[in-house]
């Protein structure tokens, strides 16, 4: 399964993408985290549904200096991504 999440709030410049990468890799997920020009972070992750739900918990929490205001999610079929990258 594939999760696409758009995370808004204070999520750029606070280590959010590396935080997501660490938790995604710990869960065995593949995908990416990328800063968007509008201040949000887009997270794409693929793996078992129960692992995606655990990642979603971490997305909503964020690292200490982040302030997550909203997480919009969409689920779709996995496309076979490998590893987890930060852009």
Curated annotation (Swiss-Prot):
Gene3D superfamilies: 3.30.70.100
Reaction catalysis annotation: an acyl phosphate + H2O = a carboxylate + phosphate + H(+)
A single GO molecular function term of this UniProt record: acylphosphatase activity
Entries under Pfam families matching the protein: Acylphosphatase
Claim: Hydrolase is one of the keywords in the record: yes
Superkingdom of origin: Bacteria
Enzyme Commission (EC) number: 3.6.1.7
Family matches, as InterPro entries: Acylphosphatase (IPR020456), Acylphosphatase-like_dom (IPR001792), Acylphosphatase-like_dom_sf (IPR036046)
Catalytic residue list: 17, 35
Location of the Acylphosphatase-like domain: 2-87
Alphabetized NCBIfam families for the sequence: PRK14433.1 (NF011007)
Family indicated by similarity: Belongs to the acylphosphatase family.
Protein name listed in UniProt: Acylphosphatase
Organism: Deinococcus geothermalis (strain DSM 11300 / CIP 105573 / AG-3a)
Gene behind the chain: acyP
């Amino acid at each position: 399964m594939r999760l696409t999440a758009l995370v808004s709030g204070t999520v750029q410049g606070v280590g959010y993408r590396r935080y997501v990468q660490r938790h995604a890799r710990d869960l065995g997920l593949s995908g990416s985290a990328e800063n968007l020009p509008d201040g949000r972070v887009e997270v794409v992750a693929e793996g078992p549904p129960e692992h995606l739900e655990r990642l979603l918990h971490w997305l909503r929490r964020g690292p200490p200096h982040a302030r997550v205001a909203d997480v919009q999610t969409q689920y779709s079929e996995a496309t076979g991504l490998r590893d987890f990258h930060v852009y």
